[in-house]
């Protein structure tokens, strides 16, 4: 490889600089992952009749259902609302994670990071 090294990795082909940059990047990734895991994301469905909260680990934290939407004659509608709210909350968590990753990597797509 020509002199100058890798862009954004300290230049000059200096292996110590490259290692320092890699360690710094790894620390930033760990910090971001920890921060995202502690965040909560919520979504609603059915005019806020259903509220779902998930965390950054993409685990459902809570589901709130307003009593007035519980209709024993139409359980399927309730199931659809819960499913919709869950999927929206999970998508919100995924979108935020992707956005933070993009900031950290400068838009470089690194498979398997999250």
UniProtKB/Swiss-Prot annotation:
Keyword DNA-binding listed: yes
Subunit structure and binding partners: Homodimer.
Cross-referenced SUPFAM superfamilies: YbaB-like
Entry annotated with the keyword Cytoplasm: yes
Domain of life from the UniProt record: Bacteria
NCBIfam families: DNA_YbaB_EbfC
Family the entry assigns: Belongs to the YbaB/EbfC family.
Organism: Clostridium kluyveri (strain ATCC 8527 / DSM 555 / NBRC 12016 / NCIMB 10680 / K1)
Alphabetically ordered keywords of this record: Cytoplasm, DNA-binding
Gene3D superfamilies (alphabetical): Nucleoid-associated protein YbaB-like domain
GO function terms (MF aspect): DNA binding
Location of the protein in the cell: Cytoplasm, Nucleoid
Function summary: Binds to DNA and alters its conformation. May be involved in regulation of gene expression, nucleoid organization and DNA protection.
GO cellular component: bacterial nucleoid; cytosol
Protein name: Nucleoid-associated protein CKL_3826
Lineage: Bacteria, Bacillati, Bacillota, Clostridia, Eubacteriales
């Amino acid at each position: 490889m020509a002199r100058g090294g890798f862009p954004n990795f300290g230049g000059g082909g200096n292996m110590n600089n490259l290692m320092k940059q890699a360690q710094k990047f790894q620390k930033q990734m760990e910090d971001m992952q920890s921060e995202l895991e502690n965040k909560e994301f919520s979504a609603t469905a059915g005019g806020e009749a259903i509220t779902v909260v998930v965390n950054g680990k993409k685990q459902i934290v809570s589901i709130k259902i307003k009593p007035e939407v519980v209709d024993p004659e139409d359980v399927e509608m309730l199931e659809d609302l819960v499913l919709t709210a869950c999927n929206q909350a999970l998508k919100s968590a995924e979108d935020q994670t992707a956005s933070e990753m993009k900031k950290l990597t400068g838009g470089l797509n690194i498979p398997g990071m999250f």
